Swiss-Prot record:
With S4 and S5 plays an important role in translational accuracy. SUPFAM superfamilies: Nucleic acid-binding proteins. The gene is rpsL. Residues 121-140 are annotated as: Disordered. This is Small ribosomal subunit protein uS12. Part of the 30S ribosomal subunit. Contacts proteins S8 and S17. May interact with IF1 in the 30S initiation complex.
Length: 140
């Protein structure tokens, strides 16, 4: 507990909010080539490279990620969820916030089933998260 004298000297400070997805907080004025402070829930971007990376210590896998240049000029690394994908260089994708816990530096997810990204094939459960259409009912 601070004394009155300490509060007079220093005062209290409000801790500033720090975004977990900072690239979604910036826009771009393309006419003036200046950054603007416009937040967005998703952003469009173009894949510059698609690769696999290995996760942090206790886990072992080859996680699919893409390097994406967004419409605001920022380049980020985004995770490609689901089994199998059709992304390659120059694919236009939609990204959303959301980190991948075991991949350092990956703070964004690619939205499946939007723009050039195909949905996951033969997906029965959690279809909306993976852009999969409802399967046609089997004929009797």
């Amino acid at each position: 507990m601070p004394t009155i004298n300490q509060l007079v000297r220093k005062g209290r400070y409000v801790e500033e909010y720090k975004s977990t997805a900072p690239a979604l907080q910036k826009g771009m004025n393309t006419l003036r080539k200046k950054a603007t402070d416009i937040s967005a829930p998703q952003k469009r971007g173009v894949c510059t490279s698609v690769k696999t990376v290995t996760p942090k210590k206790p886990n072992s896998a080859l996680r699919k990620v893409a390097r994406v240049r967004l419409t605001n000029g920022i380049e980020v690394t985004a995770y490609i969820p689901g089994i199998g994908h059709n992304l390659q260089e120059h694919s236009v994708v939609l990204i959303r916030g959301g980190r991948v816990k075991d991949l350092p530096g990956v703070r964004y997810h690619i939205v499946r089933g939007a723009l050039d990204t195909a949905g996951v094939a033969n997906r029965q459960q959690s279809r909306s998260k993976y852009g999969a259409k409802k399967p046609k009912a089997a004929k009797k």
